[in-house]
Amino acid sequence: MKKIYKSITLVAAILSLSSCGNDWLDRKPADGIPSEDAITNYNDALTARTGMYDGIQGNSNATSYYGARMFYYGDVRADDMQARTQGMRSSSCYEMLYTVDDAPNMWNIPYNVIRRANRLIEAINEKKVTDATEAQIGKIYSEALVVRALVHFDLVRIYGMPYTADNGASLGVPVIVKPLERNDLPSRNTVAEVYTQV
């Protein structure tokens, strides 16, 4: 009798588990919008454009892009500006005492802006924005292209050799012209390739 109950329980468990679909695995996040659904109309494109510019401006702390850091990268390191007091935002750049914690700020923040610009460019190329005039869409598209070029130019000036050092043959930074997947690891392009893209 015990064998019959065990067999019935086992068969019932197998049947109940096999009848479940996998749709419960395909839930959309409750606290965000999937990137492919984020830009579907003109207002979404305007919001994405604002987010792109917000990434450039930053929040005026020591890790911001144009809110603070980008000015320091060139001017402080070239002795055009001096940090007179220890602890000032520019002192670490002036002394060139970078730590492992500085790398994400100098690399990730600009590439985050490129990601935002690429998402906007992709949505417009895929004709997701249809409720605006061609001129309105073209303006946003052009702004995203300019921002992407500006950020690539900034990055190659920080991480690449000057173009005149070897006619652009040395390694620069990865040129990213489409949204990347989470595990993509793009290789570095030459300085000349970055300048050509810009």
Q: Where would I find each of the regions flagged by the language model?
A:
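Conserved, well-structured interaction surfaces
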Residues: Q86-Y159, N189-V191
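Short coil/linker segments at helix-helix boundaries
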Residues: A135, I158-A192, T196
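Secretory-pathway/luminal and periplasmic proteins that interact with or process carbohydrate-rich
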Residues: Q57-T63, M81-A83, V151-P162
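Sec-dependent bacterial lipoprotein signal peptides
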Residues: M1-S18
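A structural signal for short, hydrophobic/glycine-enriched beta-strand patches
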Residues: A30, Y42-N43, G58, F71-Y98, ...
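Membrane-proximal, proline-rich intrinsically disordered regions
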Residues: I4, C20-M70
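Short, intrinsically disordered, charge-balanced linker/junction segments flanking boundaries
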Residues: N43, T50, A192-V198
